[in-house]
Amino acid sequence: MTANDPSPNHLQLTRDGQLRHFLTLDGLGQPLLTDILDTADSFIEVGERSIKKVPLLRGRTVVNLFFESSTRTRSTFELAAKRLSADVLNLDISTSATSKGESLSDTLLNLEAMASDMFVVRHSQSGAPHFIAESVTPGVAIINAGDGRHAHPTQAMLDMLTIRQHKGRFEGLKVAIVGDVLHSRVARSQIRALNVLGAEEVRVIAPGTLLPRDVEDLGCTVEYDMARGMKDLDVVIMLRLQKERMEGALLPSEREFYRLYGLNQEKLGLAKPDCIVMHPGPINRGVEIESAVADGPQSVILNQVTNGIAIRMAVMSMAMGGQMAERQQRQQEGRA
């Protein structure tokens, strides 16, 4: 199973439309995305309590299965699970049996034998979380924490939550995504979410070497010139150069990229005065964005990090709720 196979919604949704896995935003409608945002909103205040816990996943075991490293994403998933009162296991892939030749399927079988309830999966191979969702026994939820170039649905949703907090709506908004779109799973999920939630225009601004061939099919307009692309923007999302995924010379130099596509105060001044600046992190200062902008009054980058915990709490609690509802359905059907 790969990311190019038919809609995964037979996997990620129950028969009555609840989440049971969270693999991709493809095929999910506005009501469900709005429900995720609303649920996350309700969890924001948990982080402001003296005791930052709710009992929704008490007695459940969540396994963070990260085949790619990511300090920020893994940390926020771990915090989200713990704030839901789950037990959390962080699997170190570099020392696990998988690194010693054990197959992914065997690793999963062993983890399931330990009565795990949820796997949070980050993998360099597109479609890996989908494959895992097909392989696990019923009742185990899979959350995609980023797979190859395919998708990063929780990052996109925390970005949508941040936009809604600061703009109050999606209708009428003009949003640009700037930088290395070619290698970005985040950009693909962001474009999908923005279109479903009703943004007026989604632009991508990048050199042709950093754009996928089918970029316009994703639901966006393309601009190669930063000055033109910044005009009338409500939101600008900067992406880092993913040099670890680049094959060959796609750029003359980082300095040249920054000159043409890096966000500084002068370029930000071409957007609307209340344009907000976002970045999924990690930030390469002086490559895609200057410090004065990243740390400036229009930056909401740290809000994104805070919202990551709330969004992941929402998705994890909703997916586990869907699994539990489906389990009850199976039990009732078995007694019928």
Curated annotation (Swiss-Prot):
Binding residues annotated for L-aspartate, in chain numbering: K100, R185, R240
Broad class of enzyme this protein falls into: transferase
Pathway noted in the entry: Pyrimidine metabolism; UMP biosynthesis via de novo pathway; (S)-dihydroorotate from bicarbonate: step 2/3
Cysteine disulfide links: none
An example Gene Ontology CC term for this record: cytosol
EC number of the protein: 2.1.3.2
Annotated positions binding carbamoyl phosphate: R72, T73, R122, H152, Q155, G281, P282
Catalytic reactions on record: carbamoyl phosphate + L-aspartate = N-carbamoyl-L-aspartate + phosphate + H(+)
Molecular function as annotated in GO: amino acid binding; aspartate carbamoyltransferase activity
Pfam families hit by this protein: OTCace, OTCace_N
GO BP terms in the entry: 'de novo' pyrimidine nucleobase biosynthetic process; 'de novo' UMP biosynthetic process; amino acid metabolic process
UniProt keyword list: Pyrimidine biosynthesis, Transferase
Stored HAMAP family: Asp_carb_tr
Family membership noted in the UniProt record: Belongs to the aspartate/ornithine carbamoyltransferase superfamily. ATCase family.
Quaternary structure (record): Heterododecamer (2C3:3R2) of six catalytic PyrB chains organized as two trimers (C3), and six regulatory PyrI chains organized as three dimers (R2).
Its biological purpose: Catalyzes the condensation of carbamoyl phosphate and aspartate to form carbamoyl aspartate and inorganic phosphate, the committed step in the de novo pyrimidine nucleotide biosynthesis pathway.
Name of the protein this chain belongs to: Aspartate carbamoyltransferase catalytic subunit
Organism whose genome encodes this protein: Marinobacter nauticus (strain ATCC 700491 / DSM 11845 / VT8) (Marinobacter aquaeolei)
Organism ancestry: Bacteria, Pseudomonadati, Pseudomonadota, Gammaproteobacteria, Pseudomonadales
Gene that encodes it: pyrB
